[in-house]
Amino acid sequence: MRRALLPAFVLISVLLEGCATLISEPPEQVVLPYVTNFSYSQPADGMPNGWRPWTLSRFKKATEYKLVKEDGQTVIRARASSSASGLVHPLNLNPAQYPLLHWRWKVDQLIAQADNTRKSTEDAPVRLVISFEGDLEKLEFDDRMFFDQIKAFTGQQLPYATLMYIWGNRLPRDTVLSNPHTSRIKMLVVESGRDRVGRWREEMRNVYEDFKRAFGEAPGRITAIGIMTDTDNTGENVHAYYGDIAFKKVAPPRVVFGAD
């Protein structure tokens, strides 16, 4: 069952990019209950531990991802030029126990023509993509039919739900967008505009609460997380950086002894 995680992530790319070509299934990989830090790797390692390439299509140019040193710490540098691909990390995580997602990223410039409300210009300088398990029998009729069509066409099952955190151009922060093909893929705008371009941004989101807001229900287990920088729709060039990604527990309330 766990071998289907990465192909399922590739299926998400079918919906993101309008492409129906899948990559071959990767070798067996241990599924961890945590995200392996980029900072644990060295630039000479090539690919960060625990992560694998996420190829959207053999007909699309791949974004370049490289381990580099930035301010003395190993991070991922993404360079996109009319390209779209990502890195994916399989997971087995309960978001009810570890609801807080902490990460940092940096964007050197925005994608001028990008508009995440339109399929023809739906690019983003940075994305975090999270897939979730769930009961497929609970899906709406239209979604179930769409899932069945994808499975019949590709032989693989889509994740029950997918939540993406993105950096947009103009949309207000916290805007939630739906995929035009299915209600089971949502985008949430975490950063927007030029004000914070060129600086590392520390982000913290409650994935459990964000999922409930986006999908109207509690999330199932998290099966994978990915990063993606894409400019294939706009044909532009963009550089971006990703730092460590971690799921954390909510800190217990602080007890002050002696207080009235």
For the regions a protein language model found, what residue spans apply to each?
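Extracellular/luminal beta-rich ligand-recognition
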Residues: D123, E133-H181
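Extracellular beta-strand elements of beta-rich domains used
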Residues: F38, I225, D244-F247
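Bacterial N-terminal signal peptides
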Residues: P7-E17
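Extracellular beta-strand ligand-recognition surfaces/modules
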Residues: S24, V126-L128, S183-G193, V197-G235
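Extracellular/lumenal carbohydrate-interaction signature centered on repeated Trp-anchored short motifs
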Residues: P90-L101, R194-V197
